[in-house]
Amino acid sequence: MNHETFLKRAVTLACEGVNAGIGGPFGAVIVKDGAIIAEGQNNVTTSNDPTAHAEVTAIRKACKVLGAYQLDDCILYTSCEPCPMCLGAIYWARPKAVFYAAEHTDAAEAGFDDSFIYKEIDKPAEERTIPFYQVTLTEHLSPFQAWRNFANKKEY
């Protein structure tokens, strides 16, 4: 498998997205058995969706194509090292590998600096820039109990 070919496609998608004005400079492709099954471009600004990063967009499309919520035996190629949000999505999707071209420091130099998010993760919830507050309810564990008791659940 020629990883460079798929990475070049991801970079091309990123450039096309910029030139079309659909979002930030990021592109991604997902490959299974040597063939591209899904492509994604960042379209945050045109969709008004802050989660519409190239990797997430590609993952959503690939899962629809496969009719599955995990990307077993797939490889994700992305134009840039994934941000923390995309990293989480990638781990949930479980591809067998990820290849990227540019580093997150390259993205930071272009105005896409996500280093603050990594710093926020290590802080106690109440000390984050956007404070998080837990409010316990008597029924706060009931969704998890319902999940444990649900006979037809698909574990993931």
Swiss-Prot record:
InterPro entries: APOBEC/CMP_deaminase_Zn-bd, CMP_dCMP_dom, Cytidine_deaminase-like. One of its GO terms (biological process) is purine nucleoside catabolic process. Catalyzes the hydrolytic deamination of guanine, producing xanthine and ammonia. Belongs to the cytidine and deoxycytidylate deaminase family. Keywords: Hydrolase, Metal-binding, Purine metabolism, Zinc. It comes from Bacillus subtilis (strain 168). Zn(2+) binds at residues 53, 83, 86. It is an enzyme of class 3 (hydrolase). Pfam families: dCMP_cyt_deam_1 (PF00383). Induction: Expressed only during limited or partially limited nitrogen conditions. Can be induced to high levels in the presence of purines or intermediates of the purine catabolic pathway. Expression seems indirectly controlled by TnrA and GlnR. Pathway: Purine metabolism; guanine degradation; xanthine from guanine: step 1/1. Residues 1-132 form the CMP/dCMP-type deaminase domain. The active site is at 55 (proton donor). Its cofactor is Zn(2+). GO terms for molecular function: guanine deaminase activity; guanosine deaminase activity; zinc ion binding. Its EC number is 3.5.4.3. The keyword Zinc applies. This is Guanine deaminase. It catalyses: guanine + H2O + H(+) = xanthine + NH4(+). The keyword Isomerase does not apply. The lineage of its organism: Bacteria, Bacillati, Bacillota, Bacilli, Bacillales.
